[in-house]
Amino acid sequence: MNYLVGLVLIFTIFYFFLQKNDKNMNSKIPGPKGIPILGNLLSMKGDLHLKLQEWYKQYGVIYRIKMGNVETVVLTEYPIIREAFIGNSNSFVNRFQRKSRLKLNNGENLVIVNGDIHNKLKTLVLSEMTNQRIKKYETSFIDNEIKKLFKVLDEHADTGKPIILNNHIKMFSMNIVLCFTFGLNYSYPYDEFEKASEFIKLMVEFFNIAGQPIISDFIPSLEPFIDTSNYLNTYKRIFNYTSDLITKFKNENEIHNNINDNNKSLADKPILSKLLQSFENGEISWDSVVSTCIDLQTAGADTSANTILYCLLELINNPNIQSKVYDDIKQAIIQSKENENQNDNENQEQTEEIITLSFNKYRTLAPYLSMVVKETFRKYPSGTIGLPHVTSEDVELNGYKICAGTQIIQNIWATHRNEKQFSEPDSFIPERFISQQQSANSNLIHFGCGVRDCIGKSLADSEIFTMLASLINRYEFTNPNPSTPLNEIGKFGITYSCPENKIIIKKRF
């Protein structure tokens, strides 16, 4: 009992010491009142994106919350977020460093690290994400992965039985990222599919855990009393899985080198080759190599897959929209044949059983599908609140002074469901993007905003469009129980995970 009283006394003294030192920090910014020591943390459990949306409606585009002793400002609506992350990019560019994240990889991964290491990793990865290389992958690897998956889906379609597509789509997305990163992929026979499915489940589990606030990140004195073993152990399993992939890559690469396979330039090799070369040159640490590979495969696979799944969910719940998309794709194919000479590739496309419709070839020919994809990005942003930033200096925004050292949250979910910019924001209305005006597109921040936006956005655009166009061209998707709409409420985490729904797929021809 005396121990507990002493503990409470220490926390109370510590709290009032902090209050005395930062009582004027961001004090002019409105926001919900918190409680001593914890601030607003008790109100931030569960679906945090919905709570931040609720506070936005109450306090406006800029409001202040206290996460323990961490001063936090939440920004909502595109003009404000743009002013911060583009107009004042130097002040907002850095990531907020949470101690729990630093424990995972010493803070040396692409997503979290700041400064020179981040610039080095970003330059390295972007050098591999060129439009030319992505276009090459569209016509080779993405095309091949779609055909492999469709052979599996054809078998399910022939049975007429309901199927849950989540793991199939996530495995497809994971294979795309694995090829870019490691130059390898899983096949769909059940032995490897089950192994990949276990990793997918692990990845989703980590994203869900990591999306929730860890109290000791915001009240450091509580660290000895907070159990983070599940969080740390889940990441360790991902780390070990990724380390095995790197070892496999190194072993296979050494075999190729031993048989004088030197015809492949570094530019044609996967990203891991450049990461390992930078490590051997002493430019980055081993933690940076492994953790950056983890960033690429977890974030890259999960975000694209969830967008594809949410889009299919809406097309099933709105069969009239699905019909319009199919008609749009059919017209695009006809127009493509009329506009182009019938070269060898085109002849192959006409005669092959499985047709893939690439982003670079069809995106301008299928405008309605493009609007559907944008509406999916709007209604279901993969990162509902983004990853937190921190101000490096005092800065004025919208008439308020935001102090240096303030954690900054991009309120993406509330921005995308903002009635000022999107009428009927909770409805799926692709036609809202029928205008080609730049303002209609610029209100979306699903890939983030500013110099630290999503590094793989070009690959994601290509993968998502190509997969959806090819899926809808080949299959009709329906609800086994049409009287009950499919569940569209996802699970909050670092990414907004699509719920599992049983659906029926039927070949169109």
UniProtKB/Swiss-Prot annotation:
UniProt-listed SUPFAM superfamilies: Cytochrome P450
Keyword Heme: yes
InterPro entries: Cyt_P450 (IPR001128), Cyt_P450_CS (IPR017972), Cyt_P450_E_grp-I (IPR002401), Cyt_P450_sf (IPR036396)
GO molecular function list: heme binding; iron ion binding; monooxygenase activity; oxidoreductase activity, acting on paired donors, with incorporation or reduction of molecular oxygen
Pfam families associated with the record: p450
EC number: 1.14.-.-
Residue numbers binding heme: 454
Membrane topology of the entry: Single-pass membrane protein
PROSITE patterns assigned to the protein according to its UniProt record, in alphabetical order: CYTOCHROME_P450
Stretches that traverse the bilayer: 2-19
This protein's UniProt keywords: Heme, Iron, Membrane, Metal-binding, Monooxygenase, Oxidoreductase, Transmembrane, Transmembrane helix
Primary localisation category: membrane
Compartments, as annotated in UniProt: Membrane
Signal peptide: none
Superkingdom of this protein's organism: Eukaryota
GO cellular component, one term: membrane
Record's keyword annotation contains Transmembrane: yes
Cofactors demanded by this protein: heme
Main EC class the enzyme belongs to: oxidoreductase
Family from the record: Belongs to the cytochrome P450 family.
Identification of the protein by name: Probable cytochrome P450 513A1
The gene coding this protein: cyp513A1
